[in-house]
Amino acid sequence: MKEQCVAMLLAGGKGSRLNALTKNLAKPAVPFGGKYRIIDFALSNCANSGIHHVGVLTQYQPLLLNSYIGIGEPWDLDRNDGGVSILSPYAEASEVKWYKGTASAIYENRHFLKELQPEHVLILSGDHIYKMDYGKMLEYHAEKQADATIAVIEVSWAEAGRFGILHTNDKMEITSFEEKPKYPKSNLASMGVYVFKWSVLEDALERDEKNSASSHDFGKDVIPALLEENKRLNAYPFKGYWKDVGTVRSLWEANMDLLGDHPPLDLFERNWRIYSVSPNLPPQFVADLAEIKESLVSEGCTVYGSVTRSVIFQRVAIGRHSAIKRSVVMHDVSIGEYVEIENAIVSAGIRIPDGFCAKPEDGEVLLITEEYVKKHKVV
């Protein structure tokens, strides 16, 4: 059945709530976990699930993402019987047609799907952190004889209003769907992972495109329309780790979830590896008086100070007598001596001068950029 499934990976999001982190790159391309990018998780899930036909739909700041994915070699997607295809908004004679929404993005690339004529289409978001066997979801979808299946996860009631919320009966059949309700009546959230019968999806997209009142979004328009037509929609309950990293704080939290003896998200799990494009760098160097505790420190780093419960990306230099705690330091950062940083994400490629101090109060998470350093520079 997996050979009859094509995955469509939505990777064109701007991620405006991540502020400066997405100024020059799309949200799925944001670095994560010391050596990865967010999109690595969805691509690795496809590879580990045996799904080898993957279309990646880009839009905002696509150049880095396009070159990063390339022909898909790190994820074993450079193959003759499938492979990865980069699908960008296309140009007509008069203009470039930008995607109007998530459903519009799939509709504009329907010819890619028509050529392959899959039995099922797997719709994925490229900006979530999780490990999932899509094969099991496809089997569940077939067992239920569903027209569409939506992966769902229980979220806290405080967060429920941020997500698409589903209501189901005792057979896990979806009875209603609300997109980001002000007063949620359920805490069963859509993960943005959908399986459709291709025949059902093709028809739904055609009708949605003709609807001038539609915002052309799966959650707001396509799913409610299918429910109104009494199509068979089922919820697939997911019990593993899943994180929407749409804000600076949630991105920081997801990185912190990688740390400890028994982390919520285990990067060292051998039977479900996360693949990435890895630069050819020398090993990390840890000086005699340096100290590293409960941290991930990537290749090419030199550490002379102390690092505690932090994630350090490639080619980071940490000077003597400096202390980094509960922080994420992106690649190519130079940290001077006598620096103190806590509860922060440090943007890539910046220089932190000697004596710099960033220790927020009340559990706040800082985003330290070049502009922030200039504003708070020690005189």
Curated annotation (Swiss-Prot):
User: InterPro entries per the record?
Assistant: ADP-Glc_PPase (IPR011831), ADP_Glu_pyroP_CS (IPR005836), GlgC_bac (IPR023049), GlmU/GlgC-like_hexapep (IPR056818), NTP_transferase_dom (IPR005835), Nucleotide-diphossugar_trans (IPR029044), Trimer_LpxA-like_sf (IPR011004)
Signal sequence region: none
The entry's keywords: ATP-binding, Carbohydrate metabolism, Glycogen biosynthesis, Glycogen metabolism, Nucleotide-binding, Nucleotidyltransferase, Transferase
Q: Which GO terms describe its biological process?
A: glycogen biosynthetic process
Coiled coil residues, start to end: none
Pathway, per UniProt?
Glycan biosynthesis; glycogen biosynthesis
Identify the EC number(s).
2.7.7.27
Superkingdom per UniProt: Bacteria
Quote the record's binding site residues for alpha-D-glucose 1-phosphate: Y99, G164, E179, K180, S190
> What Gene3D superfamilies is this protein classified in?
Hexapeptide repeat proteins (2.160.10.10), Spore Coat Polysaccharide Biosynthesis Protein SpsA, Chain A (3.90.550.10)
Which catalytic reaction applies to this protein? alpha-D-glucose 1-phosphate + ATP + H(+) = ADP-alpha-D-glucose + diphosphate
Share what the entry says about its subunit structure, partners included.
Answer: Homotetramer.
Similarity section: Belongs to the bacterial/plant glucose-1-phosphate adenylyltransferase family.
Q: Tell me the PANTHER family matching this sequence.
A: GLUCOSE-1-PHOSPHATE ADENYLYLTRANSFERASE (PTHR43523:SF2), GLUCOSE-1-PHOSPHATE ADENYLYLTRANSFERASE-RELATED (PTHR43523)
> What the protein does?
Involved in the biosynthesis of ADP-glucose, a building block required for the elongation reactions to produce glycogen. Catalyzes the reaction between ATP and alpha-D-glucose 1-phosphate (G1P) to produce pyrophosphate and ADP-Glc.
Record-given protein name: Glucose-1-phosphate adenylyltransferase
Q: Which organism is it from?
A: Bacillus licheniformis (strain ATCC 14580 / DSM 13 / JCM 2505 / CCUG 7422 / NBRC 12200 / NCIMB 9375 / NCTC 10341 / NRRL NRS-1264 / Gibson 46)
Question: Which gene produces this protein?
Answer: glgC
